[in-house]
Amino acid sequence: MSTPLLPSSDDFLLVILSSPSGAGKTTLTKRLLEEFPDLRFSVSHTTRSPRPGEVDGKDYHFVARDGFEERVRNERFLEWAEVHGNLYGTSLGEIERAKADPQCRGMIFDIDYQGARQIRAKLPGITGIFILPPTMPELLRRLRGRASETEEVVQRRYSVAQREIEHYAFFDYLVINDDLSVAFDRMKGILLAERCKRTRLASVAESLLRDAPAT
């Protein structure tokens, strides 16, 4: 069975946000959603355990591994991948509901390179933003700042982070998160520029020409 075609809309903005662990993606994503209330966050399904403060259905849909695998068999994911021993996936229903909402003009996906590659294969017009740490030592320091994780887990995440950064050229934009406010302003600028692209607003220009009164 092939993936169902999703409703199309020239001005509906689809954005991938990706980064290695510790680059500040989660914080930046929350700020962007506050700045752009007409964007929706794609809530992924995952088999990992919730972290302190995370809410089921808001941060992730937390599911058992067998339930996740059943959804895979039923082709209910636009993308899915295994990261750090846990499964993550983007449900087709997330995008379908967002596009059916007249108040929604776009969706943000918080996914890694594996998932981004799968989504872009099905949605080639999607915009990809990759967030970089200022230096690798700073990234390691941030990872070690997570008191809930052991040094073994930190080293594994650091190794995966290096492999993630190797795929930087896949993305359309790179944002260095040395200063959170500066990084946010740059990402905000990217979204504003994307909304003004000719391909998104061509229908507006064409309607002006079509409706122009004769002189």
Give residue ranges: language-model regions.
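P-loop (Walker A) phosphate-binding loop of NTP-binding proteins
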Residues: S18-P20
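Extreme N-terminal, non-catalytic leader segments
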Residues: M1-V15
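Post-Walker A helix-loop "phosphate-sensing" segment adjacent to the P-loop in P-loop NTPases
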Residues: E34-S42
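Conserved phosphate-donor/acceptor-positioning beta-strand/loop module used by diverse small-molecule
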Residues: G106-D112, A121-G145, I176-N177
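Conserved lysine of the Walker
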Residues: K25
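Post-Walker A alpha-helix
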Residues: L28-T29
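ATP-dependent small-molecule kinase phosphotransfer cores
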Residues: T46-M107, Y113-R117
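NTP-dependent small-molecule kinase module
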Residues: S2-P4, S148, E166-T215
